[in-house]
Curated annotation (Swiss-Prot):
Reactions that this protein is recorded to catalyse: ATP + H2O + 4 H(+)(in) = ADP + phosphate + 5 H(+)(out)
Family: Belongs to the ATPase alpha/beta chains family.
Name of the molecule in the record: V-type ATP synthase alpha chain
Function field: Produces ATP from ADP in the presence of a proton gradient across the membrane. The V-type alpha chain is a catalytic subunit.
GO cellular component: proton-transporting ATP synthase complex
Organism from which the protein derives: Streptococcus pyogenes serotype M49 (strain NZ131)
Pfam families cross-referenced by the UniProt entry: ATP-synt_ab (PF00006), ATP-synt_ab_N (PF02874), ATP-synt_ab_Xtn (PF16886), ATP-synt_VA_C (PF22919)
Molecular function terms from GO: ATP binding; proton-transporting ATP synthase activity, rotational mechanism; proton-transporting ATPase activity, rotational mechanism
UniProt: ATP binding residues: 233-240
Enzyme kind, highest EC tier: translocase
SUPFAM superfamilies: C-terminal domain of alpha and beta subunits of F1 ATP synthase (SSF47917), N-terminal domain of alpha and beta subunits of F1 ATP synthase (SSF50615), P-loop containing nucleoside triphosphate hydrolases (SSF52540)
């Protein structure tokens, strides 16, 4: 422990002297109030400290005390359903302890509840050899999540004691005799520094799709479990709703939602909606699998920088248990702005648009902690982290540094489009500019699993949309009637794909989520109509006759998005109905 004195205060940056024994990334207690800060730069005996609380009223001469430890999170039972701030202070218990709706400065509250007792069930017995990552036992944390208590990193040896029963997170639950003869006494809780990724046995190639229930994503721009995706878009384009939808319905075990520098009412929406929503996979409340980290725009700027790392470290902990985890960061642009502010106060040479020169490497550090891995331990386990980051470029300009550095790393780009949002087409993901580099892997995975030609259907549907885009300019110049019959059919089918398939209402109880079998049935109906109508045109039928003769069945195709999942056969039955009606048009003499 080293004690120094403050010499300057500049917003969230405090410079202290007499800190020659301190290290970079040490946590400090700053001033008489004991504010939490982290050393980010050392020059001789002077330490530059990033303070995670409001610094008004702090002045030169006040003491700074280092703890000798890096910024770390507590990992153990009690994380799920909890809401933390950027440095893992539990907001619910913080409010009760301080009796205030605001963050009172200098208050230290343990991240995990020290009084709560958890029922521990051992999975191993005394005398067994264990290595780091082995599961010693389990705690039923919520109705959905079984918390697996693991041997901490760098601990291995013989299990000499393990106890069943109800324990707090600090009680000794097991003892391991290590190779050097020392006894390691372990509890249900462990700590981990947030800026250091948790080690794994092996990184694997992600192939299994993350099913979100959003048709435009799952069909055209899928992300895998263990992949990384970015959602850039201008104000009002629907970034937050896309993030909320994925958090609600993604087929993962655990969701970490990081509200980083965005409006507080967005976190309020999460708190109001999530407890009422039922997870379609488990039948339990979605809150039973969710961890919330709130660092909203009215909270200290410096803590935004920590909140992203706090979230990804908690995600890695659950991944190591063998779970699939999705982490949403809304928004990484606000996090980058916090980096820019600290860089400016440190008087570093600025890069593009004032962001620090190391912006790209910091963004990469975050996204590269996602992935599909084989975890440590003698038991074979796989875990995944899917990282989805919203980016808020000013004015929707994706050429700015945060978006460009993000796109260098992630493999999925869901580009939100202001014109689509203004036309009330949601999700406003532009199908012409967005992309997914997982498309081929996911397509072949689904073809193999479902025994279907899904990837072929997706390619055909995208070709229709691209053909429509090339025809639109001709239509604007000389009108729709000047097109050939086949091209008019392309325009009609593309409109069906856009309005009846891609457009989705997040606030409709049925349309908000579409399972994969329903997506396939809906897309098959539209493509069948295109195929049969194209054949009819080649046999001499007229476009207008086909459209009039199939008006009823096309209306039913359009309404199929509102048919509940349990009535899936109704949607599948429309395929034959389409063929029958077009054949009827031909039989009537449309030649």
């Amino acid at each position: 422990m080293n004690q120094g004195k403050i010499i300057t205060v500049s917003g969230p940056l405090v410079v202290a002297s007499g800190m020659q024994e301190a290290n970079i990334q040490d946590i400090c207690r700053v001033g008489h109030l004991g504010l939490v800060g982290e050393i980010i730069e050392m020059r001789r005996d002077q330490a530059s400290i990033q303070v995670y609380e409001e610094t008004s009223g702090i002045g030169p001469g006040e003491p700074v005390v280092t703890t000798g430890c890096p910024l770390s999170v507590e990992l153990g039972p009690g994380l799920i359903s909890e809401m933390f701030d950027g440095i893992q202070r539990p907001l619910d218990r913080f409010q009760k302890a301080t009796d205030s709706d605001f963050l009172i400065r200098g208050v230290a509250i343990p991240s995990l509840d020290r009084k709560a007792k958890w029922a521990f069930i051992p999975k191993l017995s005394v005398g067994q050899e264990v290595v780091a990552g082995d599961i010693l036992g389990t705690v039923q944390e919520t109705a959905v999540i079984e918390h697996r208590v693991m041997v901490p990193y760098k601990v291995s040896g013989t299990l000499v004691a393990i106890h069943a029963g109800d324990f707090t997170v600090t009680d000794t639950v097991y003892e391991i005799k290590q190779e050097d003869g020392s006894i390691y006494q372990g509890s249900l809780m462990q700590t981990w520094p947030v800026r250091q990724s948790r080690p794994v046995a092996q990184k694997l190639i992600p192939v299994e799709p993350l099913v979100t229930g959003q048709r435009v994503i799952d069909t055209f721009f899928p992300v895998t479990k263990g992949g990384a995706a970015a959602v850039p878009g201008p104000f009002g384009a629907g970034k937050t709703v896309v993030q909320h939808q994925i958090a609600k319905f993604a087929n993962v075990d655990i969701v970490i939602y990081v509200g980083c520098g965005e409006r507080g009412n967005e976190m309020t929406d999460v708190l109001n909606e999530f407890p009422e929503l039922i997870d379609p996979n488990t039948g339990q409340s979605i809150m039973e699998r969710t961890v919330l980290i709130a660092n909203t725009s009215n909270m200290p700027v410096a803590a935004r920088e920590a909140s992203i790392y706090t979230g990804i470290t908690i995600a890695e902990y659950f991944r190591d248990m063998g779970y699939s985890v999705a982490i949403m960061a809304d928004s990484t642009s606000r996090w980058a702005e916090a980096l820019r502010e600290m860089s400016g106060r440190l008087q570093e040479i600025p890069g593009d648009e004032g962001y620090p020169a190391y912006l790209g490497s910091r963004i990469a550090e975050y996204y590269e902690r996602a992935g599909r891995v084989r975890t440590l331990g003698s038991q074979e386990r796989e875990g995944t982290i899917t990282a989805i980051g919203a980016v808020s470029p000013p004015g929707g300009d994706i050429s700015e540094p945060v978006t460009q550095n993000t796109l260098r790393i992630v493999k999925v780009f869901w580009g939100l489009d202001a014109p689509l949002a203004q036309r009330r087409h949601f999700p406003a993901i532009n199908w012409l500019t967005s992309y997914s580099l997982y498309q081929d892997d996911v397509g072949s995975y689904i073809d193999r699993k479902q025994q279907s030609n899904w990837s072929n259907k997706v390619t055909r549907a995208m070709a229709i949309l691209q053909r429509e885009a090339s025809l639109e300019e001709i239509v604007r110049l000389v009108g729709l009637d000047s097109l050939s019959e086949q091209d008019r059919l392309i325009m009609a089918v593309a409109r069906q794909i856009r309005e009846d398939y891609l457009q989705q209402n997040a606030f409709d109880s049925v349309d908000t989520f579409t399972s994969f079998p329903k997506q396939e049935a809906m897309l098959t109906n539209i493509l069948t109509f295109n195929e049969e109508a194209s054949k009819a045109l080649s046999l001499g039928a007229y476009f207008n006759e086909i459209m009039e003769g199939t008006a009823q069945v096309r209306d039913r195709i359009a309404r199929s998005k509102f048919i509940p999942e349990e009535n899936l056969e109704q949607i599948k039955g429309l395929t034959q109905k389409v063929t029958k009606e077009i054949h009827h048009v031909l039989a009537k003499g449309g030649i």
